Amino acid sequence: MDARAINSREKADLKYPRNTYIIGDVQGCYRELQELLELIQFDSTKDRLGFVGDLVNRGPNSLEVLRFLKSLSSPLIVLGNHDLYLLILGYGLMPEDSYEHTLHAVLQAPDKLELLEWLRHCPLIRYEKSLSAVLVHAGLPPQWNIKESILHAEEISTALKGPHYLAFLKNLFGNEPSQWKDDLEGQDRLRYICNAFTRMRFCDAKGHLDLESEGKTNQAPSRFRPWFEWRNPQEDNVDIVFGHWAALNGQSSAPHTHALDTGCAWGYKLTAINLKTKERFSVPCQSALRM
């Protein structure tokens, strides 16, 4: 099932899809993505797809992944930290050899600018009211409720889609500020929001981010916990679907939180969840890690 097959079909009315499948961190693993779609018997005229970010990098076929996703009818996509990194590289805001990556094919593609334009119009959060679900790459910090999280994510979307998106991206990287304050302004405010939604794993009860630790939940530094252990499921009243944290191996200890990063780019597997039934589907990695 490739992009050409979907483009050749009559566009579907997906206002009321049969099933909505959310897929974990693809990270350029196009072959595994296609195998997963075969496994779930995805029908683009009846089903809807969603992705929790990190669409690209580390795997071997980021260009094919982007072209395929762009061809879909109304996919539910949120950005991850690797997707933001691609935007920074793609717009020439950082030397291509600053870090190891597998994005060279995207950066040299004739449709690069078209793909970047499409990518930067994707949000950091998707709220699906009909399914009582929120999609985010890393997580939701504890000091914000669902409505506040959505509003803060819209601040990033406004910056990415606005006339000064290059200045925003150029100054995006960094770990500070690591603590939220309501009076944060400018790039500091945007950087904290972006880090919370795309890089967070551990934080404290007030949303102070620890962006250095990447291990399992029992490896949290003093006073820090996995972000989902601070949230109140009864107050949220939604399912939170996220990726980013491969060390969780798709397991979250908190109710109504669904971890989908199962480390495909690291040689493990790619996972999807049916949002209606909560059934999971996985395929093993077939692509050797390229970095």
Curated annotation (Swiss-Prot):
Q: What does the UniProt keyword field contain?
A: Hydrolase
Q: What is its EC number?
A: 3.6.1.41
The enzyme class is hydrolase
**HAMAP family tied to this protein:** ApaH
A Pfam family matched by this chain, by name? Metallophos
Q: CDD domains of this UniProt entry? A: MPP_ApaH
PANTHER family to which the protein is assigned, alphabetical: CYTOCHROME C5 (PTHR40942:SF4), PTHR40942
Name the chain's protein.
Answer: Bis(5'-nucleosyl)-tetraphosphatase, symmetrical
| NCBIfam families membership | apaH, PRK00166.1
User: Which reactions does this protein catalyse?
Assistant: P(1),P(4)-bis(5'-adenosyl) tetraphosphate + H2O = 2 ADP + 2 H(+)
User: What's its job?
Assistant: Hydrolyzes diadenosine 5',5'''-P1,P4-tetraphosphate to yield ADP.
